Curated annotation (Swiss-Prot):
This is Enolase-phosphatase E1. Monomer. PANTHER family: ENOLASE-PHOSPHATASE E1. Pathway: Amino-acid biosynthesis; L-methionine biosynthesis via salvage pathway; L-methionine from S-methyl-5-thio-alpha-D-ribose 1-phosphate: step 3/6; Amino-acid biosynthesis; L-methionine biosynthesis via salvage pathway; L-methionine from S-methyl-5-thio-alpha-D-ribose 1-phosphate: step 4/6. Its EC number is 3.1.3.77. SUPFAM superfamilies: HAD-like (SSF56784). GO terms for molecular function: 2,3-diketo-5-methylthiopentyl-1-phosphate enolase activity; 2-hydroxy-3-keto-5-methylthiopentenyl-1-phosphate phosphatase activity; acireductone synthase activity; magnesium ion binding. The lineage of its organism: Bacteria, Pseudomonadati, Pseudomonadota, Gammaproteobacteria, Oceanospirillales. HAMAP family: Salvage_MtnC (MF_01681). Its cofactor is Mg(2+). Bifunctional enzyme that catalyzes the enolization of 2,3-diketo-5-methylthiopentyl-1-phosphate (DK-MTP-1-P) into the intermediate 2-hydroxy-3-keto-5-methylthiopentenyl-1-phosphate (HK-MTPenyl-1-P), which is then dephosphorylated to form the acireductone 1,2-dihydroxy-3-keto-5-methylthiopentene (DHK-MTPene). It comes from Hahella chejuensis (strain KCTC 2396). Keywords: Amino-acid biosynthesis, Hydrolase, Magnesium, Metal-binding, Methionine biosynthesis. It catalyses: 5-methylsulfanyl-2,3-dioxopentyl phosphate + H2O = 1,2-dihydroxy-5-(methylsulfanyl)pent-1-en-3-one + phosphate.
Length: 233
């Protein structure tokens, strides 16, 4: 059990925190990789897709006019688990079709929905910060196994606000949330992200869900949202 006092807002990570790493790596990533080629070719000139392909060409140094080169770059980034904004945006577009077609539902750990509702009832605002695009974040919660959880959240942040291991990203989030940093709690399974948030003066807690997670000793850690005792300001 870990206790946190004076909390006005909670910012939560997704992968390894609200949702299993295996869902992302064994369901979502392969689905996007499988459908990337057809999606890019079918939507090559669509404005929303073209905007992201411009960035893929710029960041990857590949020929913007070549679907083959762009697709190869995107698939390479997926294989390397790169947190690159245009890749995440395009993955989100592909994942949406999977949700719409019922290919899968967004995984959330069993206690997550109840705890999120409880914190909202306490008057605490909830936010998401993930390397996945805002659209993908809304999908995993909007099409979750526990139903549509998006009404519980007040906002979403992705890599457009900055990298998750950069303290300035958390400072930017605090400005958007419009609460004192010390009244904002950040939840993540990744020690480097917790360190960056703590540097920005947020309260932090690590989620250690099962084996294979690097446990750090600097900050509080719990195995489940049910182990968090959060008292609002």
């Amino acid at each position: 059990m870990a206790e946190f006092n004076g909390i006005r807002a909670i910012v939560t990570d997704i992968e390894g925190t609200t949702s299993s790493i295996s869902f992302v790596h064994e369901v979502l990533f392969p689905y996007a990789a499988k459908h990337m080629d057809a999606f890019i070719r079918e939507n090559f000139s669509a404005p929303a897709v073209a905007e992201q392909l411009d960035e893929v060409a710029r960041l990857g140094g590949v020929d913007r006019k070549s679907p083959d080169a762009l697709i190869k770059q995107l698939l390479d980034w997926i294989a390397e688990d790169k947190k690159i904004t245009p890749l995440k945006a395009l993955q989100g577009m592909i994942w949406r079709s999977g949700y719409d077609e019922g290919a899968y539902k967004g995984h959330v750990y069993p206690e997550v929905a109840e705890r999120l509702r409880h914190w909202r009832e306490l008057g605490i605002r909830l936010f998401v910060y993930s390397s996945g695009s805002v659209a993908a974040q809304k999908q995993i919660f909007g099409f979750s196994e526990a139903g549509d959880l998006t009404p519980l959240f007040s906002g979403y942040f992705d890599t457009r606000v900055g990298g998750k291991r950069d303290a300035d990203s958390y400072r930017a989030i605090v400005r958007e949330v419009s609460e004192p940093a010390s009244s904002v709690l950040f939840l993540s399974d990744v020690p480097a992200e917790l360190s960056a948030a703590a540097e920005a003066e947020l309260q932090v807690c690590q989620l250690v869900r099962g084996a294979g997670i690097e446990r750090q000793e600097t900050y509080p850690a719990v195995a489940s949202f049910a182990d968090l005792l959060i008292k609002p300001a």
